Amino acid sequence: MKKYFHLSFFLLTIISFSCGSDKGPGINKDNLQKYLHVPSPSWQDQILYFIVTDRFMDGDSTNNDQGAGEYKKGDGAYWNGGDLKGITQKINYIQELGVTGVWITPPVANQWRNPQHTGTGNHGYWASRLDQVDKHLGDLGDYKMLSATLHSKGMYLIQDVVVNHFGDFYTYDGPYDPEDVSKNFKLHDVEQPMQYPFNHNDAREEEDRELGIYHFAPNFTDHSDTIQKTQFQFADLDDLNTSNPLVRDALRENFGYWITEVGVDGFRFDTPHMVEHDFWHSFLHKKEGEHLGIDLLAKQQGKQHFLTAGEVAFFPKPFDHSGTKEARKYLGTKNKPEMNSILNFPLNTAINRVFIEKKPTSTLSFRIKSIQENFQRSDQLLNFIDNHDAPRLLAKSDRQTMRQALLFIMTIPGVPVIYYGTEQELTGMRQTMFKGGTGSPDRDYFDTESDYFKFVQSLVKLRKTNEVFRRGQLKVVRDNSYGPGLFVYEMRLDDVSALILINTSEKLQLVDGLSVPTFNPGNYVSKYSIGAQNEILSVSHDRIIDMILEAKSAQVYVNTDHSQTKFDLHGTIGLNNDFSEILTTSAIQLSGKAMGVENMGLVIDGDYEHLLPITNRNQNSWFHDLSLSNLMNGKHRITAIGYDDKGSLITSSKYFTLALSTKHLFHFEDEIQDDYGPNGEYTYPSHRSFSHQQDIKAVDVSLTGNNLTLEITMSEITQIWIPPNGFDHVLLNIYIDMPDKQEGVKSLPFQNAFFPNQGEWDYRFALGGFGIEAFEGYPLISGPEKLGKSIMTPFVNVDYEQNKISVTLPAKMLGNPTTLKKTNLYINTWSGSAAYPRTIDKTRTTWSYGGGNSNSPKIMDDINIITLE
């Protein structure tokens, strides 16, 4: 009977995966048990939909308010009413999108209100009991109904799990003494955990200290300190002693319960990097005590590939493998395995840099290679563009950027994760899908006819109907090392090849001389496109592609599609190889041959928008004097292009390496520890992690051609919160006034201040540890609360020994100036982000400055204007 059921479910899954139209049988109490336990799928064939349960759908209003002052519909700090019944009621909506699995936030009983008034447990990550469903979300029967309904439709259920901590039931009200952990210990005056052994949480009790269920320790402030990170409290949440065999067995018992009782198909683990590695092997793969490890138990239930994916939140620095390698460690080794997957934060960090921050697409190429080298099965990793702990991509960028990022994760190896509401263009981080909830006062968001729902639906269909995107091998074939632009990659599975071309730039980009040996000569129509007018891919007789890719566009071609009429080129163009491979001068004369071509020009690094016309022609020869001052040092591609009498593009390319000398222009020293605001009365936020990270000591200015490098020496640099850009607790604001730009901006956006000496700025670079933003200023779109036009962002390098933050601003970022003489630079510091700086008031608080008011300038330290001579 069991074998028959497994086979039936396998066939049901295939049917559902193929057409997405199976609505499944009606689930009731009589047949519910039949659908609770199903075999594991091949995870690389799945697409997950991540739901914050309280924010998705209110299916039972009677459980909203539990009388603890924790419920306030419409307020993001409180419970809003979403529940398990709500998800079950909307499964047809989810299935119509095409996804094959649902991942929900922790459903276990939570601390409803934080005793220190820092919020409510609506998200599910503040457990009070591990073997019960939180009353706001429903009961065990509701959870079983959700599981069975999903399974009946060929879908799967992933549960979010927290093993690192419970809620906030105790704290330290005074200095911490590791020799006497009862000293200054305080139990909050709230209902305490009742479940054994987690009820032994009073450090003043000898029995509780001896049992060692918790690490009785204060908050940790330094994420780089392994001892603090694994044994101290995170955000005052009571840290479990996961090295204790009693705790490990209790966790195996409680989370195993959800597998046996509800039939969940996988776990996503919260904050796994705050738990020692040995725990994960024990918890998942061993029987130590009375209960089987999670993976062993799942196999016993017929789930041979139970998903165990960790939120390994490492944010690698650009072009650095260490973050990827750290994330890889949580899979363990062959002899001592841990989880079988992670949330792919290394890739997500690169996605943010390339698609949002407009950094060079080679950033993404590097991270892909790093992941391929470190993860044997990158097709098992959970790829995402949004999650519940950060602002949504659409809130930080635009629709076209989000479309490109979604297409990217849908056409590469891995398990795509769609954050709920992405398909409805929600912008709130934890906005509700239902009317009246936080961020959604006037309407529900379950419109299956909306343009964006259909867009996401079509992307899901593209992935599901083309195996090459799920099981193929990824190879990057063209990128850009100097800014936004081309990102071209191939997915290949046996004889099937898909070519994906993305242009992250807002300018036209040239794809030239691209070899596509798996495509036969001829014209191909795009399988899928975003923002493209021309959807034809022309492959020459020697299987080469030359084409113009439109701004912010993306196109997908598959070699199995029928190619149309072949074509012939009626002209030739050549670029002489009569210049050195390494160039040390700021100009060069180029020459070449051309026959049967018109509208000739030169394109540097694919930047077709800034094509340089070739006007010096003599019969079949051409010449051009090329300035190199606005190029960065490094390897560049130069392409001569033209069009034949049929309008076909003809190209010829060469590479060269630029090595211009760097000239140091200026050294400025600022007064040490003058970081107290314009009036000298500001105080830092009271959180103990703040010291003097916003104090500027010196600034050095250098030029390489017209590329500007600033080396900013700080009093101190910290990376307490493991920021991806290498520093935290400071936002460096760099304002630049270009002499050749007539209309600048006087006010400093969101800083309650003006450019010094009644001047105006043209470019602003806001450098933060967790994000870098850049803007071009215009009077009509920039102002006190208007940032300006978003532009490409620079890389930042950190020298911890010298306390230096270095940033290079390529000439391309500054409008390709002919000179930087008379350029004015102004630098100041604060913290937060460009549009959301930290607040200031008369008296400082944990995260707000003191010594001012809401109208005070948000400047902790600054330097005098530097004018380049």
What are these regions (language model features)?
Residues 664-665, 678-771, 834-836:
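Surface-exposed, glycine/proline- and aromatic-rich loop segments on solvent-exposed faces
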Residues 19-50, 65-68, 73, 80, ...:
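Carbohydrate-interacting/catalytic domains
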Residues 40-46, 54-257, 261-262, 282-283, ...:
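Substrate-binding/active-site clefts of carbohydrate-active enzymes
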Residues 653-671, 735-760, 802, 813-869:
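Acidic/polar low-complexity flexible segments
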